């Protein structure tokens, strides 16, 4: 199949590999991005790539906590300018509070639910769009609960570009829970612990690491030991509790919380626009279009 320049560019952005290496990888894997990433890793050309798409869309993430319930929500706008608008920021907080009050479970149900003003969220969003002059959309939200003996940690980075909500059991130390939320914002783990990693993912990673070691010309008798060592390192990179704590790299996140009598049981991390692609605009073409 013909490999487009756009596909090569996407693979380069995800792996940091050279153009020709990316083109060859895509050719060998029939244009499958995920398989091409594995191909490059097995050849030792690229490190493990987080298979998240480019961060592109604008907007805000907000975390709202009320007693034993907390909500995290992402609302998108078209420009960063609007994301800094006070009216938009108030809208995001209003929606986050309503999510907790209404106990809705899906975005569709949220849009149909009524605010205290009697208007639906959908009507409120349309009002805001009319006032602000940009397309706005509620992309996603999550609700978490805890007991009186636990703590929520809420952290917003860059004014809401990244938002994290943590649930820590066994302690009411909100500051410690917030510190862990800050760690998760910075390091971006995929899981709480290795117990959450599927057997399928572990087996897939083990196979990639094995091929990588064999392609490096390592003797087969030591490959198994190398693979297990690298697999442990991989799990440490993607599991929050096993990572070196960002505020004190001499201890793990698990050890930090254990000293406080707590244990991380859940987290939600939203980054504005992750997995979304921004419309690519050609400025010259845009000007031409306005002159017609």
Swiss-Prot record:
Keyword Cytoplasm among record annotations: yes
SUPFAM superfamilies registered for this protein in UniProt: Elongation factor Ts (EF-Ts), dimerisation domain, UBA-like
Superkingdom of this protein's organism: Bacteria
Cytoplasm among keywords: yes
Region listing for Involved in Mg(2+) ion dislocation from EF-Tu, in residue ranges: 79-82
InterPro entries (alphabetical): EF-Ts_dimer_sf, Transl_elong_EFTs/EF1B, Transl_elong_EFTs/EF1B_dimer, Transl_elong_Ts_CS, UBA-like_sf
GO CC terms: cytoplasm
Any one Pfam family match given in the protein's UniProt record, by short name: EF_TS
Cellular localisation: Cytoplasm
Disulfide cross-links: none
GO molecular function ontology, one term from the record: translation elongation factor activity
Keywords assigned by UniProt, alphabetized: Cytoplasm, Elongation factor, Protein biosynthesis
Function: Associates with the EF-Tu.GDP complex and induces the exchange of GDP to GTP. It remains bound to the aminoacyl-tRNA.EF-Tu.GTP complex up to the GTP hydrolysis stage on the ribosome.
UniProt similarity note: Belongs to the EF-Ts family.
Name this protein carries in UniProt: Elongation factor Ts
Organism: Staphylococcus epidermidis (strain ATCC 35984 / DSM 28319 / BCRC 17069 / CCUG 31568 / BM 3577 / RP62A)
